[in-house]
Amino acid sequence: MFFSQPTHLAKAEELKQAPPKGVAYSVALPGTEQPGRSPVYRAWNAQKELLTTLDPEVTTAHDIFESTAIRHPKNDCLGWRPYNSTTKSFDPYQWLTYETVQKRRAAFGAGIVELHHKHDCHRPGQYGVGLWSQNRPEWQITDLACVSQSLYSVSIYDVLSEDATEYIINHSELSCVVTSLPHIASLIKLKPSLPTLKIIISLDPLDGGEQAGHSKRAIFESMAAGLGLAIYTIDQVEELGLASKRGYNPPSASDIVTINYTSGTTGPPKGVVLTHGNAVAATSCGLITISQARGDTSASYLPLAHIYARLAEHTAFWGAARIGYFHGNIAELVDDLKLLKPTGFMSVPRLYSRFGSAIRAATVEQPGFKGALSRHIIAAKTANMKNPDPSKATVRHALYDRIWAKKVTAALGLERARYMVSGSAPLDPTLHNFLRVATGTDVLQGYGLTESYASATAQPVYDLTAGNCGSLAPCVEACLVSLPDMEYSVDDKPFPRGELLLRGNNMFREYYKNEEETRSAITEDGWFRTGDVCTIDEKGRFIIIDRRKNVLKLAQGEYISPERLEGVVLSELGYIAQAYVHGDSLQTFLVGIFGVAPDLFAPYASKVLGRTIAPTDLEAVKESLNDDKVRRAVLRDLERVAKKHKFAGYERIRNVSLKVEPFTVENNLLTPTLKLKRPPTVKVYRSLLDQLYEQAVEEQSAPKAKL
């Protein structure tokens, strides 16, 4: 049977095309420059008007899902791997169809409203519903249920501390939190500090045929007795909604779709107010970048409390793709991918770095014929990719992809993937190009923030450069503003440099109940200050070069961007899994605290020390970290990396401390999105940092033996 392409997908394909010869990807609009500010830039195909939606009939996240559910009711929608208590393992994927999800979300949404009426916490207009769970089908069913009734979700990271959870629930005045089993006891414990909370809805069953008083429900209700807290399961609420006969209460484009709390690297989380219009504009651009269609499969494992993952799932829904959720253990993600065989993959540089290290270890670093063949293939494909004629440049090879790259991608479960997308942090150019040629896949880098619904720039598939995050999405415009204190100017040559400002249909409304932060972040003429320092090349590609907020000043007056240095170290030294570069204003050089990846560090330490250290022997790995031979070997590697990347003398790291996982969410040094919290890190490791400086000074002043 012949199926015509839906209007929105046809429009996406049209907007995906390359610009005419001689036209940049992002174009400066004539006459828009101001003193200290660059011209306004827009996508080449959005110069007259910014994109709002690919389909005028679709203006909300509710519409995105509903339109696909009506068009493709029998298609697979959400999948999961059930836990098998007999085998103590996870079974193959099971799937809910779009029709089933549509019915469940309608019933659940109606039931949530009924509960708010029942417990006297219903409010006129919009109100929020808390969502605290790891990725799973019910997470998405809850979010879809909320938008079906013009409610909005307030997502809470699954690994968030109790203090941060308490802050978010109180700040957003939640009466109801939908959560998974592990968090119910925490909510009951926090209830005395949560005056607005009245309803907990469990995504997991609470009754399993136990004798009276012995079920999970009985235990939780006993704990909650006298606290004014009612506990339900999702099944109960769906039944309540079904019985109510309550229909949809669909939202409008200007309504709130979610309040997404930022990770809070320097203070309490900020509630980013995002609208349905923001969601549709960003999703439209997502479909332009990566294309989705019936039969496609998406893997869900990045935290759905992060807007990057939310955008990925909106895009899958509008493309009628199916979404398979990982079984909960990120260390076993590849097992899920091998079953899912996703047609695309969205991730972050940290995971791509691990992929790159694993691929190198299994191919180009192998001895003998296998290693030689792999190096030849990588060299040949790299030459093809860098062909000076753009029309002939390609990451694909008819023979080598079939006999070699297919095995590489199959080992990761990505043999069907047409694309890989990297976001949330810069992707090292060397790693970027290696992944392209090793997998024969379009590897695209993008840039976005919570405030931009994760969408701002993205590399088009026809551009094979690295070291940039692509051109503007057609829903947003940008400009740069000079930063004299950091010596960045929009008049710099050959390209303007300055802080990146964004404005457009995807941009957030405000910070919830925080006028001061909103006024600080948004200019009077509507531009959002990203805090990222950027340059724009001749093709209209955006390159992040610095971060305004995370700049150190050393004793000699030199400014340092530690995040840039950390990114280079992480990309160059595969055995380093975490990096913190520190500069003291009273010192003239840098020191660092690095977390190692035991599986990759053990062979390295074995070689340095001349004895075998098993990757599984964590005690032996930790012992090696304290060996001065190992420290000095790592310092030599850091010096080599510094020379390769032409670091200035004051940018070179003069001393290090090596640890296994020094920064975690649990010790409050990482945000739930695994971003380093710099001020708390300094506080926790103040004594160690002082010792590193003392040791480095002693070693520098010690007399050197003459040869």
Curated annotation (Swiss-Prot):
GO cellular component terms given for this protein: endoplasmic reticulum; membrane; peroxisomal matrix
Stored Pfam families: AMP-binding
SUPFAM superfamilies hit by this protein: Acetyl-CoA synthetase-like
Species for this entry: Penicillium roqueforti (strain FM164)
GO biological process, one term: terpenoid biosynthetic process
Protein EC: 6.2.1.-
Pathway: Secondary metabolite biosynthesis; terpenoid biosynthesis
InterPro entries: AMP-binding_CS (IPR020845), AMP-dep_synth/lig_dom (IPR000873), ANL_N_sf (IPR042099)
Source organism phylogeny: Eukaryota, Fungi, Dikarya, Ascomycota, Pezizomycotina
Region of interest called Fatty acid-binding, as start-end residue ranges on this chain: 525-549
Homology family: Belongs to the ATP-dependent AMP-binding enzyme family.
Name of the protein: Acyl-CoA ligase 891, peroxisomal
Its job: Acyl-CoA ligase involved in the biosynthesis of mycophenolic acid (MPA), the first isolated antibiotic natural product in the world obtained from a culture of Penicillium brevicompactum in 1893. The peroxisomal acyl-CoA ligase 891 converts the intermediate MFDHMP-3C into MFDHMP-3C-CoA which impairs its diffusion from the peroxisome. The first step of the pathway is the synthesis of 5-methylorsellinic acid (5MOA) by the cytosolic polyketide synthase mpaC.
Keywords: ATP-binding, Ligase, Nucleotide-binding, Peroxisome
Catalyzed chemical reaction(s): (4E,8E)-10-(4-hydroxy-6-methoxy-7-methyl-3-oxo-1,3-dihydro-2-benzofuran-5-yl)-4,8-dimethyldeca-4,8-dienoate + ATP + CoA = (4E,8E)-10-(4-hydroxy-6-methoxy-7-methyl-3-oxo-1,3-dihydro-2-benzofuran-5-yl)-4,8-dimethyldeca-4,8-dienoyl-CoA + AMP + diphosphate
Stored PANTHER family: AMP-BINDING DOMAIN-CONTAINING PROTEIN-RELATED (PTHR43272:SF33), LONG-CHAIN-FATTY-ACID--COA LIGASE (PTHR43272)
Residue numbers covered by motif Peroxisome targeting signal: 705-707
Residues reported to bind ATP: 259-270
Compartments it resides in: Peroxisome matrix
One annotated GO molecular function: ATP binding
